[in-house]
């Protein structure tokens, strides 16, 4: 019983991995209302040159629905807002959906239409996402761009008096020299040097003490080693 259960679990795992590997990939298109979806699906000339091609939509829990299909003598086919063009010489199916609406959002695919057989999927599936183009955004962007261009002139006008005024330039040096020549500043400088000298002296004492302690330890060790060699 254990072996059968183990084999069953392994088989289920193998099947799930196989389905995941064979799952078709999707390509996402994000467009706004009124725009046009333009998709080109390649196919093998030798195998599907004379076959019919179709554009399908896939809804959850339903079979793929054919929205438009080419005829055997290939000509541009239009069904509503969907236009299909089959280029036999290049092995290419050109799909266009004009004047997109939010309701057009969904999963689509190009297929080789060969009923009663299952359709052969061409290219990657198309995940179409259509959003509403808000009319307020262009107006807001237009109002914001003049403000951006107005800021540089205001900054340059504010900076020009600072560079051209002679008073600000002549007043700055006397203040700086007077501050440096005051005795208070000299006292502060001596205080700073005193503060710096104290830790240096302490560090010298610590270093000398370290050397003395190391020399004492070395002499003790040397005496012990000599004593050990003496019979």
Curated annotation (Swiss-Prot):
<keyword id="KW-0391">Immunity</keyword>
<feature type="topological domain" description="Extracellular">
    <location>
        <begin position="21"/>
        <end position="202"/>
    </location>
</feature>
<keyword id="KW-1064">Adaptive immunity</keyword>
<dbReference type="GO" id="GO:0005886">
    <property type="term" value="C:plasma membrane"/>
</dbReference>
<dbReference type="GO" id="GO:0070945">
    <property type="term" value="P:neutrophil-mediated killing of gram-negative bacterium"/>
</dbReference>
<comment type="function">
    <text>Cell surface receptor that plays important roles in innate and adaptive immunity by amplifying inflammatory responses. Upon activation by various ligands such as PGLYRP1, HMGB1 or HSP70, multimerizes and forms a complex with transmembrane adapter TYROBP/DAP12. In turn, initiates a SYK-mediated cascade of tyrosine phosphorylation, activating multiple downstream mediators such as BTK, MAPK1, MAPK3 or phospholipase C-gamma.</text>
</comment>
<feature type="region of interest" description="Disordered">
    <location>
        <begin position="134"/>
        <end position="182"/>
    </location>
</feature>
<feature type="domain" description="Ig-like V-type">
    <location>
        <begin position="26"/>
        <end position="131"/>
    </location>
</feature>
<dbReference type="Pfam" id="PF07686">
    <property type="entry name" value="V-set"/>
</dbReference>
<comment type="subunit">
    <text>Monomer. Homomultimer; when activated. Interacts with TYROBP/DAP12. Interacts with TLR4.</text>
</comment>
<dbReference type="InterPro" id="IPR013783">
    <property type="entry name" value="Ig-like_fold"/>
</dbReference>
<feature type="topological domain" description="Cytoplasmic">
    <location>
        <begin position="224"/>
        <end position="231"/>
    </location>
</feature>
<dbReference type="InterPro" id="IPR036179">
    <property type="entry name" value="Ig-like_dom_sf"/>
</dbReference>
<feature type="compositionally biased region" description="Polar residues">
    <location>
        <begin position="164"/>
        <end position="182"/>
    </location>
</feature>
<dbReference type="GO" id="GO:0030593">
    <property type="term" value="P:neutrophil chemotaxis"/>
</dbReference>
<keyword id="KW-0399">Innate immunity</keyword>
<keyword id="KW-0812">Transmembrane</keyword>
<keyword id="KW-0472">Membrane</keyword>
<keyword id="KW-1003">Cell membrane</keyword>
<feature type="glycosylation site" description="N-linked (GlcNAc...) asparagine">
    <location>
        <position position="191"/>
    </location>
</feature>
<feature type="glycosylation site" description="N-linked (GlcNAc...) asparagine">
    <location>
        <position position="188"/>
    </location>
</feature>
<dbReference type="GO" id="GO:0002250">
    <property type="term" value="P:adaptive immune response"/>
</dbReference>
<feature type="compositionally biased region" description="Polar residues">
    <location>
        <begin position="134"/>
        <end position="157"/>
    </location>
</feature>
<dbReference type="GO" id="GO:0045087">
    <property type="term" value="P:innate immune response"/>
</dbReference>
<feature type="signal peptide">
    <location>
        <begin position="1"/>
        <end position="20"/>
    </location>
</feature>
<keyword id="KW-0675">Receptor</keyword>
<protein>
    <recommendedName>
        <fullName>Triggering receptor expressed on myeloid cells 1</fullName>
    </recommendedName>
</protein>
<feature type="disulfide bond">
    <location>
        <begin position="41"/>
        <end position="110"/>
    </location>
</feature>
<feature type="transmembrane region" description="Helical">
    <location>
        <begin position="203"/>
        <end position="223"/>
    </location>
</feature>
<dbReference type="InterPro" id="IPR003599">
    <property type="entry name" value="Ig_sub"/>
</dbReference>
<keyword id="KW-0732">Signal</keyword>
<keyword id="KW-1133">Transmembrane helix</keyword>
<keyword id="KW-1015">Disulfide bond</keyword>
<keyword id="KW-0325">Glycoprotein</keyword>
<keyword id="KW-0393">Immunoglobulin domain</keyword>
<dbReference type="InterPro" id="IPR013106">
    <property type="entry name" value="Ig_V-set"/>
</dbReference>
């Amino acid at each position: 019983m254990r072996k059968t259960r183990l084999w069953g679990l392994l088989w289920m795992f193998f099947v799930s991995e196989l389905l995941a590997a064979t799952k078709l990939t999707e390509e996402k298109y994000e467009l706004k209302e009124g725009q046009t979806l333009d998709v080109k699906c390649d196919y093998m000339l030798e195998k599907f040159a004379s076959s019919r091609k179709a554009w399908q939509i896939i809804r959850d829990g339903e079979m793929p629905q054919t929205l438009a299909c080419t005829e055997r003598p290939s000509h541009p086919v239009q069904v509503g807002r969907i236009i299909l063009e089959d280029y036999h010489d290049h092995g290419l199916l050109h799909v266009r959906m004009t004047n997109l609406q939010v309701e057009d959002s969904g999963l689509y695919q190009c297929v080789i239409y060969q009923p009663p057989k299952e359709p052969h999927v061409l290219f990657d599936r198309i995940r179409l996402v259509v959003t509403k183009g808000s009319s307020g955004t262009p107006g807001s962007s237009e109002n914001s761009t003049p403000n951006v261009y107005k800021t540089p002139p205001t900054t340059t006008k504010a900076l020009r008096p600072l560079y051209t005024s002679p008073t600000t330039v002549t007043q700055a040096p006397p203040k700086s020299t007077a501050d440096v020549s005051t005795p208070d500043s000299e006292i502060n400088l001596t205080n700073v040097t005193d503060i710096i000298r104290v830790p240096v002296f302490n560090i010298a004492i610590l270093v000398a003490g370290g050397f003395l302690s190391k020399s004492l330890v070395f002499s003790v060790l040397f005496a012990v080693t000599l004593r050990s060699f003496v019979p």
